[in-house]
Curated annotation (Swiss-Prot):
Gene3D superfamilies: 3.40.1370.10
Molecular functions per Gene Ontology: rRNA binding; structural constituent of ribosome
Subunit record text: Part of the 50S ribosomal subunit.
Biological function: One of the primary rRNA binding proteins, this protein initially binds near the 5'-end of the 23S rRNA. It is important during the early stages of 50S assembly. It makes multiple contacts with different domains of the 23S rRNA in the assembled 50S subunit and ribosome.
Name the record gives this protein: Large ribosomal subunit protein uL4
Gene name of the encoded protein: rplD
C-alpha cells in the first residue's frame, strides 16, 4: 500500500494515509484508459454539423452553357462542388457519435487513472476541505497553499461552498466521488482528494 502525506487547507502536513492498492495501486490498463477517454469525448459530441450535397442545394437545374464551342470546360450544373455556392462533396450530416462501454471496463479504466496519479506522485490528500463562505479567492488560496495549479478536486459529497467557490477557476474542477471519470482524472495535472473521499472511493471500488 502506498503511504502518502495528508495536508490541511493551509498546506501544512498533518499526518499520513495508506492508500488501498485495490483502488490506487492497480496495474494500468492503457487500452481501456484510452477507450474510456474516447468514449467520454464521443458521448459529449453534439453531432449536429450539417452541409448540403449538390443534390440538396437549390437551383442549378439548367446547364450553364452549351457543351461545345464556348472555350470553357464542360459543365452540367452551377451547383457542382467546384462552383461557388455549389454543394459539398461527402457533406457531413447529423449523427450520434456515442458508443457504449460496459461497467467493468469503465471501472478498470478509472482505477488505472487513479493509480497512475499515485505512481506519478501527482496526488494530494486533504484532511478536509471546508469553506465558511462562497469565495473564489479563498479557494484559490487553498490551491496556492498546496502548490497546485491544474487540479481535479474530489470531495466526498455535496459541498456547495467548495463547488461554487472553485467554479470560476478555469484550471480547476470540483467533483464528488460519484461524479469522477477517467477523462477528468487524466486531464488535470494533480488529483486533490479529501481523506473522506479516499475512504468513500475505497468503500465503493475496493
Amino acid at each position: 500500500m502506498a503511504n502518502v502525506s495528508v495536508y490541511n487547507i493551509e498546506g501544512k502536513e498533518v499526518g499520513s494515509i495508506e492508500l488501498n492498492d485495490a483502488v490506487f495501486g492497480v496495474e494500468v490498463n492503457e487500452h481501456l484508459v484510452h477507450m474510456a477517454v474516447v468514449n467520454q469525448l464521443a458521448n459529449n459530441r453534439q453531432g449536429t454539423q450539417s452541409a448540403k450535397t449538390r443534390s440538396e442545394v437549390s437551383g442549378g437545374g439548367r446547364k450553364p452553357w452549351r457543351q461545345k464551342g464556348t472555350g470553357h470546360a464542360r459543365q452540367g450544373s452551377t451547383r457542382s462542388p467546384q462552383w461557388t455556392g455549389g454543394g459539398v462533396v461527402f457533406a457531413p450530416k447529423p449523427r450520434d457519435y456515442s458508443f457504449k462501454m460496459n461497467k467493468k471496463e469503465k471501472r478498470i479504466a478509472l482505477l488505472s487513472a487513479l493509480s497512475s496519479k499515485v505512481a506519478d506522485n501527482k496526488i494530494v490528500v486533504l484532511d478536509a476541505f471546508n469553506l465558511d463562505e462562497i469565495k473564489t479567492k479563498k479557494f484559490a488560496e487553498v490551491m496556492s497553499n498546496l502548490k497546485v495549479d491544474k487540479a481535479l478536486v474530489v470531495i466526498e459529497g455535496e459541498n456547495k461552498n467548495v463547488v461554487l467557490s472553485g467554479r470560476n477557476i478555469p484550471t480547476v474542477k470540483v467533483s464528488a466521488t460519484n461524479e469522477i471519470n477517467t477523462y477528468d482524472v487524466l486531464k488535470y495535472e494533480t488529483l486533490v482528494v479529501t481523506k473522506a473521499a479516499v475512504e468513500k472511493l475505497e468503500e465503493v471500488y475496493a
